[in-house]
């Protein structure tokens, strides 16, 4: 008898040996021992409190910035969905969003409420949970500029609230990536007042720019590498000759050379292998280290 046969009772869905590829934008990767789709915050807390504490746990959103290796993932992967996708305008230019809310939806809801400053989220793939954890941003704006507080749940199912100061934000990084793993439940953001139509016009400009410069309809994980100090990753990849160059079923997009894409039949090994080959080549040619922005999890196949 294993821990998988002794799972706590849950109101949400428990899926055993479930393929993770359909849960990610790359559409690759092996199975998780267990995928848990909690019904709501209480269901998640009760499950974690009843789960064997030795079992690894991690949470995902829509899998937009995630590469799951072909051998799959040990433990429980928690997919946050309907019970975590509420948005509520709080007044005083503040808005609260659940961790499963798509970034673009938060931008639209903020615009409808006349809250400016969150427009950039319309250009960020993924959900609020991931945005808060990695200080997501684009076109000169970042999460640190607008988030005020975050509620998280730890592995023991205990909830606490953190201020933006507690998060110690830097470029594409927060304190949530260090130390004890936690699950983001929701966050409160603050913008500035403006007319909804003016906000929506700025969002439309971001959307148009993104559609002409990024392969948003491909199987991609968004930006592959962080920008090194003083450099643009896309330019380093491009100048090293990797734009549009096939590597198994993987390629750096001809449209944007910092976007790794699955051209149809890629494995996770193709995608990660290409990324590592490019990192090594760029380092050899320029002396500049490229660091992954995409999160890679699981076992090699």
Curated annotation (Swiss-Prot):
<keyword id="KW-0131">Cell cycle</keyword>
<keyword id="KW-0133">Cell shape</keyword>
<dbReference type="Pfam" id="PF02873">
    <property type="entry name" value="MurB_C"/>
</dbReference>
<dbReference type="GO" id="GO:0008762">
    <property type="term" value="F:UDP-N-acetylmuramate dehydrogenase activity"/>
</dbReference>
<feature type="domain" description="FAD-binding PCMH-type">
    <location>
        <begin position="27"/>
        <end position="194"/>
    </location>
</feature>
<feature type="active site">
    <location>
        <position position="172"/>
    </location>
</feature>
<dbReference type="GO" id="GO:0008360">
    <property type="term" value="P:regulation of cell shape"/>
</dbReference>
<keyword id="KW-0132">Cell division</keyword>
<dbReference type="InterPro" id="IPR016166">
    <property type="entry name" value="FAD-bd_PCMH"/>
</dbReference>
<dbReference type="InterPro" id="IPR016167">
    <property type="entry name" value="FAD-bd_PCMH_sub1"/>
</dbReference>
<dbReference type="InterPro" id="IPR003170">
    <property type="entry name" value="MurB"/>
</dbReference>
<dbReference type="InterPro" id="IPR036635">
    <property type="entry name" value="MurB_C_sf"/>
</dbReference>
<dbReference type="GO" id="GO:0005829">
    <property type="term" value="C:cytosol"/>
</dbReference>
<comment type="function">
    <text>Cell wall formation.</text>
</comment>
<keyword id="KW-0573">Peptidoglycan synthesis</keyword>
<feature type="active site">
    <location>
        <position position="293"/>
    </location>
</feature>
<dbReference type="Pfam" id="PF01565">
    <property type="entry name" value="FAD_binding_4"/>
</dbReference>
<protein>
    <recommendedName>
        <fullName>UDP-N-acetylenolpyruvoylglucosamine reductase</fullName>
        <ecNumber>1.3.1.98</ecNumber>
    </recommendedName>
</protein>
<dbReference type="GO" id="GO:0009252">
    <property type="term" value="P:peptidoglycan biosynthetic process"/>
</dbReference>
<keyword id="KW-0274">FAD</keyword>
<keyword id="KW-0521">NADP</keyword>
<keyword id="KW-0961">Cell wall biogenesis/degradation</keyword>
<keyword id="KW-0963">Cytoplasm</keyword>
<dbReference type="InterPro" id="IPR036318">
    <property type="entry name" value="FAD-bd_PCMH-like_sf"/>
</dbReference>
<dbReference type="GO" id="GO:0071555">
    <property type="term" value="P:cell wall organization"/>
</dbReference>
<feature type="active site" description="Proton donor">
    <location>
        <position position="223"/>
    </location>
</feature>
<comment type="similarity">
    <text>Belongs to the MurB family.</text>
</comment>
<dbReference type="InterPro" id="IPR016169">
    <property type="entry name" value="FAD-bd_PCMH_sub2"/>
</dbReference>
<keyword id="KW-0285">Flavoprotein</keyword>
<dbReference type="GO" id="GO:0051301">
    <property type="term" value="P:cell division"/>
</dbReference>
<keyword id="KW-0560">Oxidoreductase</keyword>
<dbReference type="InterPro" id="IPR006094">
    <property type="entry name" value="Oxid_FAD_bind_N"/>
</dbReference>
<dbReference type="InterPro" id="IPR011601">
    <property type="entry name" value="MurB_C"/>
</dbReference>
<comment type="pathway">
    <text>Cell wall biogenesis; peptidoglycan biosynthesis.</text>
</comment>
<dbReference type="GO" id="GO:0071949">
    <property type="term" value="F:FAD binding"/>
</dbReference>
């Amino acid at each position: 008898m294993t821990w998988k046969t002794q799972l706590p009772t849950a109101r949400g869905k428990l899926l055993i040996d479930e393929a993770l590829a359909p849960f990610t934008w790359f559409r690759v990767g092996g199975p998780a021992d267990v995928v848990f789709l909690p019904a709501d915050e209480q269901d998640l807390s009760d499950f974690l409190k009843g789960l064997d504490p030795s079992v690894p746990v991690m949470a995902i959103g829509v899998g937009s910035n995630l590469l799951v290796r072909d051998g799959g993932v040990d433990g429980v992967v928690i997919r946050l969905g309907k019970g975590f996708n509420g948005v509520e305008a709080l007044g005083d230019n503040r808005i609260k969003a659940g961790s499963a809310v798509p970034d673009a939806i938060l931008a639209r809801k903020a615009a409808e409420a006349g809250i400016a400053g969150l427009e950039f989220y319309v250009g960020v793939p993924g959900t609020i949970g991931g945005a808060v954890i990695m200080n997501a941003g684009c076109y000169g704006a970042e999460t640190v500029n607008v988030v005020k507080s975050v509620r998280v749940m730890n592995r023991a199912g205990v909830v606490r609230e953190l201020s933006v100061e507690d998060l110690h934000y830097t470029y594409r990084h927060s304190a949530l990536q260090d130390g004890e793993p936690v699950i983001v439940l929701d966050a409160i953001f603050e913008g500035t007042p403006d007319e909804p139509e003016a906000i929506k016009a700025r969002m439309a400009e971001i959307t148009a720019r993104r559609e002409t410069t990024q392969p948003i309809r491909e199987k991609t994980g968004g930006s592959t590498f962080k920008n090194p100090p003083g450099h643009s990753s896309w330019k380093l990849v491009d100048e090293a000759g990797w734009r549009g160059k096939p590597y198994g079923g993987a390629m750096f997009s001809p449209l944007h050379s910092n976007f790794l894409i699955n051209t149809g039949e890629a494995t996770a090994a193709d995608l990660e292998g290409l990324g590592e080959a490019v990192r090594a080549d760029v380092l050899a040619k320029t002396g500049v280290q490229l660091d992954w922005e995409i999160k890679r999890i699981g076992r090699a196949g």
